[in-house]
């Protein structure tokens, strides 16, 4: 049995070699000749999986080590009898911590407390719900917008997007990309919505580029009305609007979900799915794969305030480290993908063990995802 894996999928060779012969290949584009001699294909979001890629090949299973699946024609795979698995929620924590890193940076720069802000979360799935939990642990007011969940009668106080535009100081988008249908998210933030944003609002897009109308956003920024913008995703990736990048506060190369833990979760989830598909079910403990982090233990004296949280969060991951490299190479063909391929190792907050002499600080850090313990001072 031969399994093709994206060369940038961590731990893929190590895991899938337990099931068969593994060949690592580039994800964009996948070499067609390899597909003609393989049984399974494991991809990331850069690979478009559809009839034109797989028709006539012996591939009988596709796994994507990503939460999003808009790069996969699931209907065609089903019709063709090809097994499929994604990795829902694999990088949700990474995206939440990206949003926090950006918000804590902007709060320090502009001198505001997050507790004084109302944060509107658009899309309350794996990412949005975790973001809500962590924000509320800090006592921050959140407003939720998720029309499909509201229509299903899911538990939660769901608002309309209009209400979020009127009331929220931060709008952060965490939806899938739906190009049509009743819950279309293509240009969910369209020209009308962007024009209506209050001065000083923070707009964050870390889901899919086309959820926000990039041309309309640039027009608003060029009009000189104050708006803080954080973009990890862009229309037309890997090509992006360089003028828009120059106008935003933070711009990164679709890496919000790129923690080592998130990537490893993605690989292990599709590995477990494929092992079950071929009747050789296996489970993988994530901690057995991960190396020791750069920083792994620290002592915190006293209570946890916003500046201290920012320093702890940025000790693990400061979003600015990914903003500067993109600005340096923006507009040069191939560089966007290169930044993603050669991405510096990044860990999640759970990799940092924090000893606190303040019991309340330890409890709060645990709720925020840090590995914290109360250690009374002697």
UniProtKB/Swiss-Prot annotation:
User: Which family is this protein grouped under?
Assistant: Belongs to the D-isomer specific 2-hydroxyacid dehydrogenase family. PdxB subfamily.
Taking the record's annotation, the residue ranges forming a coiled coil are none
Q: Which reaction does it catalyse?
A: 4-phospho-D-erythronate + NAD(+) = (R)-3-hydroxy-2-oxo-4-phosphooxybutanoate + NADH + H(+)
Species whose genome carries this gene? Salmonella paratyphi A (strain AKU_12601)
User: Which gene name belongs to this protein?
Assistant: pdxB
Asked if the record carries the keyword DNA damage, the reply is no
Origin, by domain of life?
A: Bacteria
Enumerate the active-site residues.
Answer: 208, 237, 254
Kindly list the residue ranges recorded as spanning the membrane.
none
**A cellular component term (GO) from this record?**
cytosol
| Subcellular location(s) of the protein | Cytoplasm
Binding-site positions, NAD(+):
146, 175, 232, 257
Q: Which GO terms describe its molecular function?
A: 4-phosphoerythronate dehydrogenase activity; NAD binding; protein dimerization activity
Q: What is this protein called?
A: Erythronate-4-phosphate dehydrogenase
Q: In which pathway does it act?
A: Cofactor biosynthesis; pyridoxine 5'-phosphate biosynthesis; pyridoxine 5'-phosphate from D-erythrose 4-phosphate: step 2/5
Q: Which InterPro entries match?
A: D-isomer_2_OHA_DH_cat_dom (IPR006139), D-isomer_DH_CS (IPR029753), D-isomer_DH_CS1 (IPR029752), D-isomer_DH_NAD-bd (IPR006140), Erythronate-4-P_DHase (IPR020921), Erythronate-4-P_DHase_dimer (IPR024531), NAD(P)-bd_dom_sf (IPR036291), PdxB_dimer_sf (IPR038251)
Q: How does it assemble?
A: Homodimer.
Q: What keywords appear on the UniProt entry?
A: Cytoplasm, NAD, Oxidoreductase, Pyridoxine biosynthesis
Q: Summarize the protein's role.
A: Catalyzes the oxidation of erythronate-4-phosphate to 3-hydroxy-2-oxo-4-phosphonooxybutanoate.
Q: What is its EC number?
A: 1.1.1.290
Summarize where substrate binds, as residue positions: 45, 66, 258
Any Pfam family: 2-Hacid_dh_C
Q: Please state what class of enzyme this protein is.
A: oxidoreductase
């Amino acid at each position: 049995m031969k399994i093709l894996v994206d060369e940038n999928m961590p731990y893929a060779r190590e895991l899938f070699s337990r099931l068969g012969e593994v060949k690592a290949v580039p994800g964009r584009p996948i070499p067609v000749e390899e597909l003609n001699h393989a049984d399974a294909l494991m991809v990331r979001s850069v690979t478009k999986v559809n009839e034109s890629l797989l028709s006539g090949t012996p591939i009988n299973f596709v796994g994507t080590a990503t939460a999003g699946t808009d790069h996969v024609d699931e209907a065609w795979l089903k019709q063709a009898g090809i097994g499929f698995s994604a990795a829902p929620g694999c990088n949700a924590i990474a995206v939440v911590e990206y949003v926090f890193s950006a918000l804590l940076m902007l709060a320090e720069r502009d001198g505001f407390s997050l507790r004084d802000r109302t944060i509107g979360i658009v899309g309350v799935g794996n990412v949005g719900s975790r973001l809500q939990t962590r924000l509320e642990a800090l006592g921050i007011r959140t407003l939720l917008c998720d029309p499909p969940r509201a229509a299903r009668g899911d538990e939660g106080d769901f608002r309309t997007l209009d209400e979020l535009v009127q009331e929220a100081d931060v709008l952060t988008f965490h939806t899938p990309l739906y190009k049509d249908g009743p819950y279309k998210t293509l240009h969910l933030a369209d020209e009308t919505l962007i024009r209506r944003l209050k001065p000083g609002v923070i707009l964050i897009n870390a889901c899919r580029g086309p959820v926000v109308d990039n041309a309309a956003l640039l027009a608003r920024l060029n009009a000189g009305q104050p708006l803080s913008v954080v973009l990890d995703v862009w229309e037309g990736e890997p090509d992006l609007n360089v003028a828009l990048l120059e106008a935003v506060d933070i711009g990164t190369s679709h890496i919000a979900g790129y923690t080592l833990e998130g990537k490893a979760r993605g690989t292990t989830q599709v590995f477990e799915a494929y092992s079950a598909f071929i009747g050789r079910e296996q489970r993988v403990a994530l901690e057995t794969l991960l190396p020791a982090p750069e920083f792994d233990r620290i002592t915190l004296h006293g209570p946890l305030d916003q500046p201290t949280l920012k320093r702890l969060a940025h000790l693990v991951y400061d979003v600015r480290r990914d903003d500067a490299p993109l600005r340096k190479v923006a507009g040069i063909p191939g560089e966007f993908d290169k930044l993603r391929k050669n991405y510096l190792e990044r860990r999640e907050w759970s990799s940092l063990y924090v000893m606190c002499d303040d019991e309340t600080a330890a409890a709060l850090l645990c709720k925020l995802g840090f590995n914290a313990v109360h250690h009374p001072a002697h």
